[in-house]
């Protein structure tokens, strides 16, 4: 909806935040833009991913049809203040921090981390994402890459 408002009000540039979960569940690392729509999505967040993909496609159409200057950013796994720090179902970094702090308080010598440790993930602090959004507003307009 904000993209339509941007078009109507002649906003110079607007930002659309995507998500790394738009890429196929078994996409090769490092993930590349061209992997979009090349395989099945992770089932647990499929609806969210499809909504984000629809948003990206809308942005592409507004860019091509109406010359609206839109930057689509695909942040990786974000962590930071006010995140989900639950030890059992929180986001990866905050959950690990909670487990480490709890183990330190209890003077434990080891902790149990979930998963196999095999997935490769990238993480970005929320404040760094904010800086990158501001920085992306300042870049000169470039042709949409496909």
Predicted region positions:
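Hydrophobic positions on the long internal alpha-helix
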Residues: 1-6, 58-59, 132, 136
